[in-house]
Amino acid sequence: FGALAHESHADLHNWYEQQRDYYRKMIFELYEGFKEVEPDFIVSRPEASIYFVIDVRKVAKPGFDGVEFASWCAEHGAVSLDDGKEYTLLMAPLNGFYSGKKGEDNPGRTQLRVSFCENPDLLRLAPELLSKLFRAYEAQR
């Protein structure tokens, strides 16, 4: 934070505005993309974070577990897109973000976090990737 002490308030304000504008556009495009390919996914609209929370509870078969799905995507999940290349999507399951009593349903079980920490051209593939990976996973489960 010491380096920021030498920056003017106006320069910091301009930098923050640039960041907001950059992410605002990306958030809008990705949100619309997720809703277009999977209208029944519950998709957050981030305000202060650089990730989406996507809940698949309305479309997942009973017993869906985000940890197992995220692991499957990392280890086995690969889908081809129109360019002929195979891709996967790395996500963070949200099971561990909630506390509760043993035996209670964990709302994070069907929730996944998709980060914006990727180049925008690849990030634009996320809605189609998640849809295809989710459908492939559910078909084999």
Question: Which residues does each PLM region occupy?
Answer:
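PLP-dependent class I/II
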Residues: 1-141
